[in-house]
């Protein structure tokens, strides 16, 4: 398995033609700010780096597609030795993250704890009331100070998003169908925890495992993993989940990210000019990939 976070820098002119025009939504680039587009571009570069270096597919032969619900996948005609190879990306706050599995179904989400853009934390919780079950709200509100409550809110949110992204159903999934029994309540930076359990429609989902991490003081990462039917991989529930592990994310620099990159198209100065010309638009905290 592979877990890769990337601290997001500003992109240079040469980056854009490395990604390739078919993998960049030009309309999206125009609509949003550079700070939002940069992690989205980073996510695409992370996928290409992963596929090129782990599956030995030449960078310029990599063909990516999206499912009907928008999840990025390798094209079926790719020279892929792992037919169940699965990956997922997320970006929010200061990081873009990627999780990949050779056989297991996987989803990843990252959330940064920050104050709501408008109103108080209790007002924000009231607006989001229907996103969590009563038991989840009890856990969130069990802490005395509001900042720690907000921490737990975003940790719960990352868990739900990781599951939804793993199954690839998009925005139509009713979040209250999911209930997480979170354990432990406090996470140490750099540790990986696998004790949290998922209940779907009141029934425990034992085929699913959740890896929780804190990259730093403000960023939670949740990885959802499920064994597909017919897989020879060991059962995910057979692992010892009683203790945190030291398996940390591999931190990439920008130079790491593009170390194996090759240009996909001739450099187009007008494309870069268009990229830089876009007016910056304030982005709400919940913007995701």
What are these regions (language model features)?
Residues 1-289:
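Core catalytic alpha/beta fold that binds nucleotide/phospho-ligands
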């Amino acid at each position: 398995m592979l877990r890769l976070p990337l601290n997001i820098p500003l992109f240079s002119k040469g980056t854009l033609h490395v990604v390739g025009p078919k993998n960049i939504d030009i309309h999206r680039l125009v609509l949003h700010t550079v700070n939002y587009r940069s992690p989205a571009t980073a996510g695409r570069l992370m996928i290409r780096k992963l596929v090129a270096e782990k599956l030995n597919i030449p960078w310029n032969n990599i063909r990516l597609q999206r499912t009907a619900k928008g999840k990025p996948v390798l094209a079926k005609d790719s020279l892929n030795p792992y037919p169940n190879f699965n990956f997922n990306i997320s970006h929010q706050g200061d990081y873009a993250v990627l999780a990949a599995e050779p056989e297991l179904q996987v989803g990843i989400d990252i959330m940064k704890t920050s104050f709501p853009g408008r109103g108080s934390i209790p007002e924000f919780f009231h607006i989001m009331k229907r996103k969590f079950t009563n038991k989840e709200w009890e856990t969130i509100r069990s802490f005395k100070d509001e900042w720690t409550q907000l921490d737990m809110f975003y940790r719960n949110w990352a868990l739900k998003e990781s599951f939804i992204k793993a199954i690839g159903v998009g925005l139509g999934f009713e979040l209250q169908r999911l209930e997480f029994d979170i354990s432990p309540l406090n996470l140490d930076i750099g540790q990986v925890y696998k004790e949290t359990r998922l209940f779907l429609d009141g029934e425990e989902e034992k085929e699913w495992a959740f890896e929780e991490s804190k990259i730093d003081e403000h960023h939670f990462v949740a990885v959802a993993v499920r064994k597909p039917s017919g897989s020879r991989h060991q059962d995910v529930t057979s692992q010892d989940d009683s203790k945190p592990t030291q398996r940390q994310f591999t931190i990439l620099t920008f130079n790491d990210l593009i170390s194996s990159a090759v240009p996909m198209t001739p450099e187009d100065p007008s494309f870069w000019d268009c990229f830089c010309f876009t007016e910056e638009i304030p982005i709400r905290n919940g913007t995701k990939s």
